[in-house]
Amino acid sequence: MGEAFQLLKARHSWTSTEPGIAMTISTSSSARFATRHSAQEDVFALVIATVLVSFGVVLLRQAGVMTGGTAGIALLIHYSFALPFGAVFFALNLPFYYLSLRRMGWLFTLKTFCAVALVSFFSDQHAVFIHIDQLQPFYAAVLGNLILGVGFLILFRHKASLGGVNILALYLQDRYGFKAGWLQMGIDIGVLLASLTFISLPILACSILGAVLLNFIIAQNHRADRYSA
């Protein structure tokens, strides 16, 4: 999910408020003059996006497939200790809101907090309405990440995200000069390698394929030179 967040970062202009850091990311002219979404549109979009993302996570979880980022860490804890994914995902994101507030501002942080809370809630509610007896891992990795990609695109278009280690990577880049993309990749690789303690190599291959597919979807559909919304 690291490349996806990098594309979101490059698309909008955010200025760091960290003392000693003067960092502004340029905004494309098309995005600068785009009509802003209304509050009602943002609320509707966040609900739709989080329903999609949470259902994508349910498919991955049901098939035992992994993903990267904070969601991957939450799945790792879920598989290891049988804790509810929603509660773990919500708790893992809590430390990152302070960095988000400093890095992206209060509106982005508020939307991200709401998105994380909704994904945490919906991911545990889908099981009330849907029971999956059998799910092939390859199919789950492809379909789950397709759905995740659509959900992320909606969140990004409405200037929100699912926070987590993406924000940490961007903060460390601003503060210490580390490359956020490489940091994110390192975290994702670490999560996937840690998952080898309870998943097989074929499942790991499906997980890697799904992660590549997710980033490809966002890279192709969240571009400032093509879309202004």
Q: Each predicted region: which residue ranges?
A:
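Core subunits and conserved enzymes of cellular information-processing
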Residues: F5-A229
